[in-house]
Curated annotation (Swiss-Prot):
Organism of this sequence: Olimarabidopsis pumila (Dwarf rocket)
Function comment: DNA-dependent RNA polymerase catalyzes the transcription of DNA into RNA using the four ribonucleoside triphosphates as substrates.
Subcellular location: Plastid, Chloroplast
Name assigned to this protein: DNA-directed RNA polymerase subunit beta
GO terms classed as biological process: DNA-templated transcription
Top-rank taxon, per record: Eukaryota
Primary location class: plastid
Sequence similarity: Belongs to the RNA polymerase beta chain family.
Keywords: Chloroplast, DNA-directed RNA polymerase, Nucleotidyltransferase, Plastid, Transcription, Transferase
Pfam family, one: RNA_pol_Rpb2_3
Catalytic activity: RNA(n) + a ribonucleoside 5'-triphosphate = RNA(n+1) + diphosphate
Enzyme class: transferase
Entry EC no(s): 2.7.7.6
GO cellular component terms, semicolon-separated: chloroplast; DNA-directed RNA polymerase complex; mitochondrion
Length: 1072
């Protein structure tokens, strides 16, 4: 963010800036840092030395363009070259060559990487910052026990604790603890140095017994004692180099490497002045930590809040990429060592180029982007989704928490999140509170902390300009910070008023003169998703959370429309998403069509290709439409073409439609929604979806697979759309079951499997009858549509390991239908229950039928009243032809500001349009409307308006599923589960209760046995249902009962059954 020259103005930072800064930091600093750590490598005889010259590294611009990388499923990466030297020590000769080390995937203008043709994004992780933390817990006797936990850069922990006898221990694991004197001695301090460097030497001397003195008499003894206790080894181990190496690897490297941030934190917490480049834990640190712990026991010092953001650090793209580079170079080091020793063994003369291979670096990055939990496939449902995905913060991932182990305190909102992490935007479900979103103005500082901007206030007499400061969570505790609601008030009023402020995690009310800093923007605490909700201050936070998640699920519509009521951030979201085409230079439009725009400016001609029907990974359609005419002069930064879900360079996710809040014959019970057929026939909520189907050809042991149109196994009508090569033609309309690509796989058939006529042909004429099975690509259920693109990707090399891939893209036009999910921007979601004819919908006093009917009972209990303000203001805006952009918390101007604005606009609309029903003083905002079926007015006045309603990606076409017959699970013999496996219904516990409630014993028996898991009976059921007979009752048990018997047998419990006749039963009764 930049502070402008004007007083109190600033610009919102680019929403992708976090990703760009991270990648730039990796290229600028991390790359050199890791390359400079690469050691000099010598052979066993110390005759040859290999080294890298870091200063000469070079990244080459990629030869392939982004668009082609996606098209051909390649990685958009840059080649890394470094100069390497091979020195012969005997002759002092040096051979220097420029060598290729490997490919590093690059970041594009959207802040994403393209790996194997797929857009991927690396999200930021929040980890516990390395350093020392003091906490206290109550033991079983109710006495406070103080502990100091040292966390290393790798996440390893070392706990210091004081027992009842005032002895200090270092706890390595739950079971193992080591005396602090032994640990300090093993790290190289003698007793005299220990006692000189502590504030309470008498406490240390109090638990120093003769036995302990002997243990720490020398460094070797201390290391042996430490090794024995750490590794739980009995007997008398002997001091050796390998023992030291094992300790170094298992203990010191994992638990004692603090890193740059850890060293800074420990110096600050323990008041030390150890140099920053000393990144390992020293005896001085441990002794100072023990001193501080003793001070805590005596009531000095403060405990640490582990959930405070000052005790967290952000692991950004730069850190993750740098870690991977370090890992790749360690692998490369092993390769070079092996190659040098191999060359000497075989008496070959090595060269730098022969020693280095590019495989370690390239494979490390490919596996990182493909497998690492923090590298995710970019969600491209709509432009908002793309941007929000890159601004996520995750507590999960390597070194972090898991959804099962994280407690409520970690998930909860903390005062230090203010202006840094959005208190609203988080995922729902098991990861609630563990995946957050960055606030709009937050940025990542040099030490991995989250910084937020504030304005510094000077005294009036100085007349200085307001200065903007970026503060980390540890800094802003010492300032009085005025909350955002003091923003709009002018100076004169502020001086007389007491204002709400934040100080040391408390919210106070103080005089204006005492304020040091103030917030810069009402949206400062929110993420992008929450900032797009108008009137958010009138909504319950749970509903705002749902809304910020649901806006990311909105499908781009075929005809987008910008919202009447917005917040003002829509334009920046659209521009930063990279979806609209923007002019990079000023000039004149020479030519424009649907595929490209030709622009002339500053002496040269520039062709800008437009995106045409590109599929996103959520199957939505990405498409650009030109917005400029031929001959028009344009400026730099002007919109040339709108993309999916943008209009005039503004985000447009939904439609402004006429809505009434009223019950209608029970069709909007429990959040169901009633809509007019106008929304279907007028293509109001029509969206395009593109599905990808692919097939590969392999070389089998019987020979290569063939793509062909000649497939004898299938009837001609299924092959009607194929061209002479056997691939579906562009523009064809295809239905379920049609062949998209004809393919034959060779197979060897047994003599017995030939038909008699085939055997005769072979015997008489010697004709070899071709044996192959068809393995065509067929269109699955629900996939009907038009073929818009076919791609035949042939990888270089053409071997059996590089199969040819054919991809077919099919476009579907989907109108809105019963079962689709729609939602507003206030967490008001619902499923469409009925589509009414236009003439049956309720209509207004000017004769207009409403488009949608919502249930009014969805508002009061959920407390999302913002939708009512938006609804009424939208109606006024549509009548006055105005668009409103409203910042949140407008009550800081005056009481009831939102209501006054809405009513004044409705009143003005009523006057200008001469429609008194728009604003009726008896029930403002409501109106009398009429039943379309009878023409009678409804009893009560109804709220009508024009809110912005989105169509979400949860569509009935993707979810509806039926099964007549299909696969069964081998173990239970019950139908498989799920749409993708063509699964069937399972009657579960709750369904059984429902049926039991009606006493339907026979239906229950059928459902649970014959039709489900009785292998013979279910075949008979199908036959008798078709013929129309009665279902025969089987005598044997169903499969699930047999499974139960088998499981009991495995527990050595035999279950036998025998038949008791009525006669025997009578005899036994008499005997009794």
């Amino acid at each position: 963010m930049l502070g402008d020259g004007k007083e109190g103005t600033s610009t919102i930072p680019g929403f992708n800036q976090i990703q760009f800064e991270g990648f730039y930091r990796f290229i600028d600093q991390g790359l050199i840092e890791e390359l400079s750590k690469f050691p000099k490598i010598e052979d066993i005889d110390h005759e040859i030395e290999f080294q890298l010259f870091v200063e000469t590294y070079q990244l080459v611009e990629p030869l392939i363009k982004e668009r082609n990388a996606v098209y051909e499923s390649l990685t958009y990466s840059s080649e890394l070259y470094v100069s390497a030297g091979l020195i012969w020590k005997t002759s002092r000769n040096m051979q220097e060559q420029r060598i290729f080390i490997g490919n590093i995937p690059l970041m594009n203008s959207l802040g994403t990487s393209i790996v194997n043709g797929i857009y991927r994004i690396v999200i930021n992780q929040i980890l516990q910052s390395p350093g020392i933390y003091y906490q206290s817990e109550l033991d079983h006797n109710g006495i406070s026990v103080y502990t100091g936990t040292i966390i290393s850069d790798w996440g390893g922990r070392l706990e210091l604790e004081i027992d009842k006898k005032a002895r200090i221990w270092a706890r390595v694991s739950r079971k193992q603890k080591i005396s602090i004197l032994v640990l300090s001695s093993a790290m190289g301090s003698n007793l005299r140095e220990i006692l000189e460097n502590v504030s309470y030497p008498e406490i240390f001397l109090s638990f120093l017994t003769d036995k302990e003195k002997k243990k720490i008499g020398s460094k070797e003894n201390a290391i042996l004692e430490f090794y024995q206790q750490f590794s739980c080894v009995g007997g008398d181990p002997i001091f050796s180099e390998s023992l030291c190496k094992e300790l170094q690897k298992k203990f010191f490297h994992q638990r004692c490497e603090l890193g740059r941030i850890g060293r800074r934190n420990i110096n600050w917490r323990l008041n030390l002045n150890i140099p920053q480049n000393n990144i390992f834990l020293l005896p001085r640190d441990i002794l100072a930590a023990a001193d501080h712990l003793i001070g805590m026991k005596f009531g000095m010092g403060t405990l640490d809040d582990m959930n405070h953001l000052k005790n967290k650090r952000i692991r950004s793209v730069a850190d993750l990429l740098q870690d991977q580079l370090g890992l790749a170079l360690a692998r490369l080091e092993n390769v070079v060592k092996g190659t040098i020793s191999g060359a000497i063994r075989h008496k070959l003369i090595p060269t730098p180029q022969n020693l280095v291979t590019s495989t370690p670096l390239t494979t490390t990055y490919e596996s990182f982007f493909g497998l690492h939990p923090l590298s995710q496939v970019l969600d491209r449902t709509n432009p908002l989704t793309q941007i929000v995905h890159g601004r996520k913060l995750s507590y999960l991932g390597p070194g972090g928490l898991t959804g099962r182990t994280a407690n409520f305190r970690i998930r909860d909102i903390h005062p230090s999140h203010y202006g840094r992490i959005c208190p609203i935007d988080t995922s729902e479900g098991i990861n609630v509170g563990l995946i957050g979103s960055l606030s709009i103005h937050a940025r990542i500082g040099d030490w991995g902390s989250l910084e937020s901007p504030f304005y510094e206030l000077f005294e009036k007499s100085k007349k200085a300009r307001i200065r903007m400061l970026f503060l980390s969570p540890s800094q802003d505790e010492y300032y009085m910070i005025a909350a955002g609601n003091s923003l709009a008030l002018n100076r004169g009023i502020q001086e007389e008023q007491a204002v709400p402020a934040r100080y040391r995690q408390e919210f106070l009310t103080i005089a204006w003169e005492e304020v040091h800093l103030r917030s810069i923007f009402p949206f400062q605490y929110f993420s992008i998703g929450a900032s797009l909700i108008p009137f958010i201050e009138h909504n319950d936070a749970n509903r705002a959370l749902m809304s910020s998640n649901m806006q990311r699920q909105a499908v781009p519509l075929s005809r987008s429309e910008k919202c009447i009521v917005g917040t003002g951030l829509e334009r920046q979201v659209a521009l930063d998403s990279g979806v609209p085409a923007i002019a990079e230079h000023e000039g004149k439009i020479l030519y424009t069509d649907t595929e490209k725009i030709v622009l002339s400016g500053s002496g040269d001609t520039l062709t800008i290709p437009l995106i045409m029907y590109q599929r996103s990974n959520k199957n939505t359609c990405m498409h650009q439409k030109p917005q400029v005419r031929r001959g028009k002069c344009i400026k730099k930064g002007q919109i040339l073409a709108d993309g999916a879900a943008t209009v005039g360079g503004e985000l447009a996710l939904g439609k402004n439609i006429l809505v009434a809040y009223m019950p209608w014959e029970g069709y909007n019970f429990e959040d169901a929604v009633l809509i007019s057929e106008c929304l279907v026939y007028g293509d109001i909520y029509t969206s395009f979806h593109i599905r990808k189907y692919e097939i590969q050809t392999h070389v089998t042991t019987q020979g290569p697979e063939r793509i062909t149109k000649e497939i004898p196994h299938l009837e001609g009508r299924l092959l009607r759309n194929l061209d002479k090569n056997g691939i579906v033609m562009l523009g064809s309309w295809v239905e379920t079951g049609d062949i998209l690509v004809g393919k034959l796989t060779p197979q060897v058939a047994k003599e017995s499997s030939y038909a008699p006529e085939d055997r005769l042909l072979r015997a008489i004429l010697g004709i070899q009858v071709s044996t192959s099975k068809e393995t065509c690509l067929k269109l699955p259920i629900g996939g009907r549509g038009r073929v818009i693109d076919v791609r035949w990707v042939q990888k270089k090399g053409g071997s059996s390991y590089n199969p040819e891939i054919i991809r077919v893209y099919i476009s579907q036009k989907r109108e809105i239908k019963v079962g689709d999910k729609v939602a507003g921007r206030h967490g008001n979601k619902g499923i469409i229950s009925k589509i009414l004819p236009r003439q049956d919908m309720p209509y207004l006093q000017d004769g207009r039928p409403v488009d949608m009917v919502f249930n009014p009972l969805g508002v009061p209990s959920r407390m999302n009243v913002g939708q009512i303000f938006e609804c009424s203001l939208g109606l006024a805006g549509s009548l006055l032809d105005r668009h409103y952009r409203i910042a949140p918390f407008d009550e800081r101007y005056e009481q009831e500001a939102s209501r006054k604005l809405v009513f004044s606009e409705l009143y003005e609309a009523s006057k200008q349009t001469a429609n008194p029903w728009v604003f009726e003083p008896e029930y403002p905002g409501k109106s009398r409307i009429f039943d379309g079926r009878t023409g009678d007015p409804f009893e009560q006045p109804v709220i009508i308006g024009k809110p912005y309603i989105l169509k979400l990606i949860h569509q009935v076409d993707d979810k509806i599923h039926g099964r007549s017959s299909g696969h069964y699970a081998l173990v239970t013999q019950q139908p498989l589960r799920g749409r993708s496996k063509q699964g069937g219904q399972r009657v579960g516990e709750m369904e059984v209760w429902a049926l039991e409630g009606f006493g339907v014993a026979h239906i229950l028996q059928e459902m649970l046995t014959y039709k489900s898991d009785h292998i013979r009976a279910r075949q008979e059921v199908l036959g008798t249902t078709i013929i129309g007979g009665t279902i025969p009752k089987p005598e044997d048990a169903p499969e699930s009962f047999r499974l139960l018997v088998r499981e009991l047998r495995s527990l050595a419990l035999e279950l036998n059954h025998f038949f008791v006749s009525e006669k025997n039963f009578q005899i036994n009764r008499k005997e009794v």
